[in-house]
Structures are given as C-alpha cells and as structure tokens.
C-alpha cells in the first residue's frame, strides 16, 4: 500500500490528521517499532517519546508524528515520509487495520461442531471445529466461534461477538454486542462460595449469572465468576487483560481497564473508567470510585474516592506513597543516626 493511499484512509478516522508531507510516497508492506523498521515499514512517535533519539538512526520508510517541530525537522532532514496527527498512536492503530486486514472465516458451521437442536445460531455466524453449544443457547448474527469453544445451556451471545479457541461460557451467561472472549478464558464459572460448618465446608450453590455488556473484551486465561444469586456485571467497553480473576457478584462501570493478574474479590464495586494496573488486588465489598487509578501491586481494602490515584499495600494516595517509599529507602541511614544519638546521649 502506498503511504498516500494509507493517509487518505486515515484522514477519515478519529486520529485527527493535521497535514502530511508532499513528494515522498513509499510503498509500505507492514509496520514495526522505530528501532526495527525498514524502508518498507511504517512507525510512529508521540510527544516526548523516549525513542526520539532513535529517529536519527532509524531506517523507517514512513512515520506518523505529533505536531512537534523537532521531530518534523528531523524527519524532513532524513528524507522520511511523514504525516502529522493530533493522536499518532491512534493513527497507528488505525493504520494497522489497513496494513494487516483480518481474514474472517466463512459463515458456516463445521461438521464436527455439536449444537443442541434447541440452540439458535444467528445468520452470518461462523462456528469452528469441535465447538459445543448447549440447550437453549442463542448466538446472534455475524459472530465468530473458534475451535474448541464450549457454550453451556441458556447462554446468550449478542451480534458480532468473537469467541477464541477453547473459551468457555457457563450456564446463563449473557454477552452483549461486539464482545471478545480470548482463548481459555472462562465466563460464568462457579463463584468461590462455601459455608463453614462443624463438618467442614458446605458448598453454596452458585445460581446467578455473569453479564458482559456491549464491547467488553476478556483476555486469555481470565475467569469471571457467577454469584450464588444475582449477577456479576462487567460494564460496556471494559477491557480485561490476560490472567485476571473477577469474583462473584462484582460490578464494574463502563470503560474500565484491568491489567494482567488483577484480582477483584466478591462483591466489590468498581466505578466507570477505573484503571487497575498489574497485580492490583481489590478486597471483597471494596468500592472504587469513577476514574480512579491503582498502580501496580496496590492492595485496595477500603473505599477509593472518584478520581483518586492510589499505590502501595494497603493502598494509600499515590503522593503519600511516593513520600513513604522515599523514606523507606533512607531507613538504614536513619537507624544508624538513631544509634549514634543513643550512644552519645548521657544515660
């Protein structure tokens, strides 16, 4: 694809094309990071990007740049084709769709798939080899169900969803439109519910369901449990990384992002637009307000106010945590000073 052709497509997107350089129009065969790109590949830079220095030595053929004069001047001096965008990262994401178009499987049902006669598969839906679909389940139109997916009884999958290989949807699960469940993820598994008795642990039946609203994406190996009663609900547009555990009865707002190894205990309430970085733990029944952010390995045991940034274990406001971390590194020196003061102080 010619760079000029790509830019014509991108100018209709959401990245905000400002202007593009005239005269240079390389043929692009793909994309790569700036330090690895060749003359037939596209890359991008953001304002203040740490790779700015690498531009001088890069063999990249074309660039998507921010409106930053030093980058524009350097690209011009090196004879690199470029276009300037308000959001070059978003432009790069849109460009990847053009450079690497996805191949959609044919809308047919593989003969090895096992589909209950009372299940419904919508028009345009592709069902791969060894898929199992249980009684009363309903798949919407234009879905893609990859090999080995298991859909239990009474599951509802909205239009345009994609279920990757070996994903499992347990009974009663509900998926809205455009959801993606990646390989080996489990939606609607039994919640961790047991009642202590004199004879040991008595299992609490988990009769509830999991609801994924429109546009939710679930990463590989992630599990989302159903509760004993009621529902576990994931808000529209929420993106969940690999290996995340979401307990029974959790509710999240719209547009959240949870990184790998996040664990959310049963009954927690997560607001809209919340970001939980890697390995964050949220205790049962904790409440996290809208747009709050928890940095990696934070342990949230109480409530987090809307818009607050927290860090550490137990989680505290990020600025306070930074001060505490700075103090912690000075503890050996402080202990030495205290010993000297004690030694020099008359008894």
From Swiss-Prot:
The keyword Cytoplasm does not apply. Its EC number is 2.3.1.191. The active site is at residue 248. Gene3D superfamilies: Hexapeptide repeat proteins (2.160.10.10), MurE/MurF, N-terminal domain (3.40.1390.10). GO terms for cellular component: carboxysome; membrane. The keyword RNA-binding does not apply. GO terms for molecular function: N-acyltransferase activity; structural constituent of carboxysome shell. It catalyses: a UDP-3-O-[(3R)-3-hydroxyacyl]-alpha-D-glucosamine + a (3R)-hydroxyacyl-[ACP] = a UDP-2-N,3-O-bis[(3R)-3-hydroxyacyl]-alpha-D-glucosamine + holo-[ACP] + H(+). InterPro entries: Hexapep, LpxD, Trimer_LpxA-like_sf, UDP_GlcNAc_AcTrfase_non-rep. CDD domains: LbH_LpxD. GO terms for biological process: lipid A biosynthetic process. Keywords: Acyltransferase, Lipid A biosynthesis, Lipid biosynthesis, Lipid metabolism, Repeat, Transferase. Pathway: Bacterial outer membrane biogenesis; LPS lipid A biosynthesis. Belongs to the transferase hexapeptide repeat family. LpxD subfamily. NCBIfam families: lipid_A_lpxD (TIGR01853), PRK00892.1 (NF002060). Catalyzes the N-acylation of UDP-3-O-acylglucosamine using 3-hydroxyacyl-ACP as the acyl donor. Is involved in the biosynthesis of lipid A, a phosphorylated glycolipid that anchors the lipopolysaccharide to the outer membrane of the cell. Homotrimer. This is UDP-3-O-acylglucosamine N-acyltransferase. The gene is lpxD.
